[in-house]
Amino acid sequence: MFKKPLITFLAITIGMFWQISLLKAQPIVLSREFGVNLGFSSFLGDLGGSDDIGRAFFWDIDPEVTRPALGIVYRQEIIPRTAFRFNAIASMVKGDDALTDNEFRHYRNLSFRSPIVEVSGEIELSMNRFTGIKKKRWTPYIYAGIGGFYFNPQAQYDGEWVNLQELGTEGQGLPEYPDRKKYSKIAVCFPIGGGFRVLTYNNWVLGFEMAARLTTTDYIDDVSSYYPNPDYYFLHYDLEKAVMAAALSNTSDGTRPDLIVPEGGRGDPTNNDAYIFGGMITFTYHMEFQRNVSSIKCYFSDDNK
């Protein structure tokens, strides 16, 4: 759902740099910022709290399972109004079928938690600048980019948190399901977001932003495709691990065979998971430096002095 805006954003950015490469360079003042951001995270995927089948967008957010998010951010202007930014953010995401009224999801009764440790780089476009003769002390901005993140879904078993990837709760790694491979706990994300920043009179910048992270994995919550036949665990695992895998693969109470059948649907394999960092308050320090950068007529001319 974000593919078209992302492609447009990247095309405009690439075109801008191509034009700049053809023009004469001159010294201008640019800005850089470094600081921290604090907000909340929320998971968007097969597990969630809305009354619909899980969907990767804001209307599937469950406020009950949002968790704090903390990170650092570095932003540097490449050309006026266009900056590169680097983010490193850590948080925990959660999901619980018990919180939804959707019949299938509530009966499925799965739950999870997973750490998210992300690093990413983005191109950011701002309406106004904090430097130059036309500088302002406020600006809205948008950004898009690419990053990578680590995740490790866990569920509770006998009062302890258990790593789910090693168990193969959908039959991953079992010879009976050669098409179900163990998933990696490292994946790619595509941040898309925006916000608003204000420059104070002592060079500190206070901002507020919200962003979605589309990903290349459907296993942040360890739920994607189909239930396995639990008997296969006992053919290949030791008894303790087989019992645990069977129990965490299907946590329903077995009273509704019309909803959950052996080797039937467990998740939605057609949509990858996503997560958001929302309500992010950024607190950065503003600095200026001079470098030779090409100019574009009209758009940058008055900012170069």
Residue ranges of model-derived segments:
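Structural signature of outer-membrane beta-barrel domains
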Residues: 41-45, 87, 91-95, 147-153, ...
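Gram-negative (and chloroplast) outer-membrane scaffold detector with strong preference
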Residues: 80-166
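Residues that define the transmembrane beta-barrel architecture of outer-membrane proteins
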Residues: 30, 64-68, 115-119, 138, ...
